[in-house]
Amino acid sequence: MKKDDKQTKDLEKWQGKLSSAKSAYSGTLDKMRKREAMYYGSHEIQGAKKDATNVRNIIYELIESQVDSTYPLPKVTAIHREDEDKARKLESLLRNQARRMHFTELNDRSERTVPVQGADFFHVEWNPAAGYHCTLGDVEIELRHPRQVIPQPGVYKLDDMDYVFVQISKSKEALEARYGIKLDTDTEDAPDARGGDDGSTHTGVVTQNIVYYKHDKGTVGMFSWVGSQVLEDYPDYYARTAEVCTKCGRRRVGDVCVCGNKKFKEQPVQTLTLTQDVMLSSGEVLPAQVQGEDVPIINPDGSVQLDNDTGEVILMPGEMQANEIPAYKPHGFPLIERVNIAASDMFLGVSDVDIVADQQQAINKYGTKIQEKLLKGGSWVILPEGVQAELNDDELKILRVENPSQRSMIDVINVQPNVQNDQNMLEYNYNWAKSTLGITDAFQGKYDSSATSGSAKQFSANQSAGRLQSKREMKNNAYAKLYRKMFEFLLAYADEPYPMTDTDVDGEQQYGHFDRVEFLKRDAAGELYWNDEFIIEVDPASNLASNRERLWDMAKVDFQAGAFGPIGDLNSARTYWTWNKSTGYPYAATVLEDINKQLEAQQQMTQGVNAVDLEGNQTGDLTENVQF
């Protein structure tokens, strides 16, 4: 079967599966639109003929109250003792990557999407056009809205799926430039993947459909298309590709293969060719060239030479060949799901909007009712028959009466509706919603009459935070998986040493490189393998470390309590300011330098006094010897 025919059949296959998957997912997609509308303050009242005229958006308020602008930093632990230095270097690399890719912005968007929709996804890719000047390619992370990720019907866990779809709205010109083809379509197949309630399409924007699928004992493949045109088809998505001879399968090293064939094809390869000698962390050197297998000596007539005594074929050393090492491949789909509240029977987690939707609807009704009552209330004026009042905005109005009796008949009746019960029900629903999500006034920074002291208020806030611990654990779990996937991509594709920087325990800036060859090891059987045996999680204390002002205040209290040593001692001050320097305290390096100078001068003075004492003792001993 020709490649074009196979791609056509694959295209029809995946188009059909996408249609079925999206149909099964349509109910969830409809809910997503309603959730976003409520988050942005929808005026719709379910079951009512008219919309709300006054909306107190508690959904927006309660979700924004939970936003955590910090993201957890990686923590890498070595499983083997000899890998401790590699673990520290890997941890520094992942921290560098998080800063380079501006995880703060990524996290900020995720903090809204996850509680509203129940989940979102990190999409990990390798961009060969990215990287520093001395590197080729780099890891890229994109945040995918749950409406862009279409799951396999009937399967709720991403790792258990046979396939999963990703729909991305992209510029037509950008896709044409990237893949070098002319796209036939000029409109979006799925405008809902881009977002927006109107569902309108835009000229020059198309929908790229991507499917990641598993086959052949877990091998991950990728198929991508726009309209009816195939963009990418990789049965082994993570495998490296190389040009090989169509006849003998050897790697291409020139225009003509050693077998004489001139035709080559691109195909996945499971090994990498060394271009230079490399040294493993064990000290073993892998040469770029190795001796080939012994070959028989051929006589001029084409026969092989035999040993006259034994009759065995005489062999000579083979030609030098390029050395090959195994290629590393990441595991699983390149998608990481971050869940709000885990549920066993749902692909996405539980949405906060769904939980408090009834309370929001009730508040919409009561808010509208209160406003209508107040607006319809007012004052009624009683006038005698025939008396006319001036109806204008003048401050002084004239009312003409014929006699005093008409004046006595003039009166005003104030009609003020009672909205107390409506206000009470509105507040009840607001408090019910807060209680359901585990949010208290202290957690929001509001006045809390139940907390009579600062410690009590902090305790109340901590209790509320404890109820939200599950969400934080889901966030930490997602970031830990993301850091693991980033490490796998760098281990697979970062061919050049990757520059990185970090601050050591003394607060000094250190510079170095991440070289993936350091993770290449040889096992007991003599086989080479890539060492990815590290526990990658997140550091719970990293959020505190990012809040430097609080950290400095805590250290100052410890210093005053003598935790760094006796107060007034220069060595204690040096320890304290060394710690401050490591956390980026302003001008800590200048203070530390001055303390070191004082210690050095103090030490020199002490040495001088000791030298004088020693000289005096020697003179005294000499005098005693002479007298004796």
Predicted regions and their residues:
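N-terminal-proximal low-complexity accessory segments that begin disordered
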Residues: M1-N127
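Terpene synthase/cyclase
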Residues: R33, Q46-V55, T70, Y328, ...
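Terminal, low-complexity, charged helical segments
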Residues: T77-E84, E91, R95, T135, ...
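Non-catalytic, regulatory and substrate/membrane-recognition segments associated with hydrolase enzymes
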Residues: I210-V211, G221
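C-terminal anchoring/interaction modules
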Residues: M1-H43, V114, F122, N127-T135, ...
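Mature extracytoplasmic enzyme cores
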Residues: N209, E243, D354-A357
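Hydrophobic/aromatic interaction determinants used to assemble and anchor large protein complexes
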Residues: C257-C259, P326-F333
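Acidic/polar, low-complexity linker and loop regions
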Residues: S69, L73-Q97, D160-D192
